[in-house]
């Protein structure tokens, strides 16, 4: 089931220029790396009118695949060091990863887990 996945995709969306701050925080929480994508928010005018503040439309999306057991620590570290109340303005959410291909470090850990299960 999705609840029993071994890995999670952590998605952090930060204001442009703050990906290093977000990644440092994530690494302090246990992340081993990530991928940064540059993006632009849409529908910002309406959000600005609703919130009454100026919003930065240029964003950076930081993608981190981590073990499910590390997810909460990584997300908490990001929010503590670069969260929505900071200049980074980061929001974070996660999605279950049901399978991977080409992520060698994750595949190695999966192989080790299978070997451990077979030896017990």
List where the protein language model places each region:
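Positively charged, small/polar-rich N-terminal and surface patches that mediate targeting and assembly
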Residues: 1-120
């Amino acid at each position: 089931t999705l609840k029993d996945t071994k890995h999670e995709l952590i998605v952090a969306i930060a204001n442009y220029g703050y990906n290093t701050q977000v990644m440092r925080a994530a690494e302090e929480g246990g992340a081993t790396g990530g991928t940064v994508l540059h993006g632009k928010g849409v529908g910002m005018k309406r959000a600005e009118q609703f919130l009454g503040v100026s919003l930065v439309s240029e964003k950076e999306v930081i993608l981190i695949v981590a073990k499910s057991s590390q997810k909460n620590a990584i997300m908490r570290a990001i929010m503590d060091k670069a969260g929505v109340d900071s200049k980074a303005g980061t929001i974070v959410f996660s999605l279950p990863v049901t399978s991977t291909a080409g992520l060698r470090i994750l595949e190695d850990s999966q192989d080790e887990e299978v070997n451990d299960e077979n030896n017990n």
